[in-house]
């Protein structure tokens, strides 16, 4: 059956990490039937709550093979909070859900350590979670991880692309690597399932890192720099570049009749993606249709405010943000 003692031990071990995320709006502590958070509406005329949920996908298999579980939680938080900031919202709270074959307290605590670190980076509170042990349903050493966030934005400040027009500038916020999408293809490219030891090799292209280390680089959390830009710049659209790459995600923030025109030579693609393309003999179109290609998020701003937006990004944790392309008349994404 379920190991209740292990469950109690997990909670004790994770408390120190959860405590890092608490602020004056959190009411009570761990152990309640729900997480309480006092919403401060000061500064909001008409506050609107926005929610998001996501997981980490099969990147978890890389973490399991590498036996490294302390950053995968950052990925989980990032996948959720990066989505809600696309509406202009500030994340407030986060909850995690871990399903496992066997509750190994030290491993669970490492996972939650990463979740807590992600919450600190996103300036939100980890107000609850669930660890579900599924003996007989999942292999003992395996687990799955999902997360849920709630954010707030003033109704009049919900991002709208209504004024987007030809000539607007598209800015790129670099990724840390593959982030948390496309790992089923990554595993196929390097034949990881059949040859897991390949993760411990260090291809010359990766500058001394092993393949496993490069693939496990946690998804970047863009909350703080983007919120700073939103305070001073008329941002017309934000896209989180996840599964589906450029072709699926950039159009989600485009106004009808507008297209994103991007020169492929301007995309600063890290060596990891070049290694993947070469090893898997993957077409350029499929790479841009699957992976972020080194761009984790894009912001569309008026041309006259592009320099100001870049200055803010450079001063707030995104020193490598750059101009990626422009808005033109048309539909979708034009990579030329």
Predicted regions and their residues:
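N-terminal amphipathic/basic leader segments beginning at the initiator methionine
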Residues: 1-25
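Residue-level signature of catalytic and energy-coupling elements of molecular machines
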Residues: 3, 54, 167, 240, ...
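Short, acidic Gly/Pro/Ser/Thr-rich loop/turn segments
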Residues: 7, 43-44, 56-59, 154-157, ...
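Hydrophobic face of alpha-helices
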Residues: 11, 109-112, 183
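Glycine-/charge-enriched secondary-structure boundary and capping motifs
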Residues: 16, 107-125, 138-145, 195-199, ...
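Glycine-rich phosphate/pyrophosphate-binding loop regions near the starts of catalytic domains
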Residues: 16-176
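Short loop/turn motifs at secondary-structure junctions
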Residues: 88-90, 185, 234, 320
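Short, acidic (Asp/Glu-rich) active-site segment that either coordinates a divalent metal cofactor
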Residues: 144, 157-210
């Amino acid at each position: 059956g379920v190991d209740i003692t292990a469950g109690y031990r997990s909670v004790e071990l994770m408390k120190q990490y959860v405590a890092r995320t608490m602020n004056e709006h959190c009411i009570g502590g761990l152990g309640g039937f729900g997480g309480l958070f006092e919403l401060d509406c000061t500064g909001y005329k008409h506050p609107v709550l926005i929610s998001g949920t996501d997981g980490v996908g099969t990147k978890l298999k890389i973490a399991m093979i590498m036996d490294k579980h302390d950053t995968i939680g950052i990925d989980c938080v990032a996948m959720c909070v990066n989505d809600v900031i696309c509406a202009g919202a500030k994340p407030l709270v986060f909850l995690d859900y871990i399903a496992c074959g066997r509750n190994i307290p030290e491993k669970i605590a490492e996972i939650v350590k990463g979740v807590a670190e992600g919450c600190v980076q996103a300036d939100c509170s980890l107000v609850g979670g669930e660890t579900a042990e599924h003996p007989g349903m999942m292999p003992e050493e395996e687990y799955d991880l999902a997360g849920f966030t709630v954010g707030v934005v003033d109704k009049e400040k919900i991002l709208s692309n209504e004024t987007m027009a030809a000539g607007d500038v598209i800015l790129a916020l670099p990724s840390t690597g593959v982030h948390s999408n496309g790992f089923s293809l990554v595993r196929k490219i390097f034949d990881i399932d059949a040859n897991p030891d390949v993760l411990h090799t260090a291809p010359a292209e990766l500058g001394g890192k092993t393949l496993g280390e490069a693939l496990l680089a946690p998804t970047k959390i863009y909350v703080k720099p983007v919120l700073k830009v939103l305070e001073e710049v008329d941002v017309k659209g934000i896209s989180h570049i996840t599964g589906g790459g450029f072709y699926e995600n950039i159009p989600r923030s485009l106004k009808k009749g507008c297209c994103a025109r991007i020169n492929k030579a301007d995309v600063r693609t890290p060596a990891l993606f070049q290694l993947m393309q070469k090893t898997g003999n993957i077409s350029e179109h499929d790479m841009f249709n699957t992976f972020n290609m080194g761009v984790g998020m894009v912001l569309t701003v008026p041309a006259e405010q592009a320099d100001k937006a870049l200055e803010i990004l450079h001063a707030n944790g995104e020193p490598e943000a750059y101009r990626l392309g422009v808005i033109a008349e048309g539909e979708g994404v034009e990579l030329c």
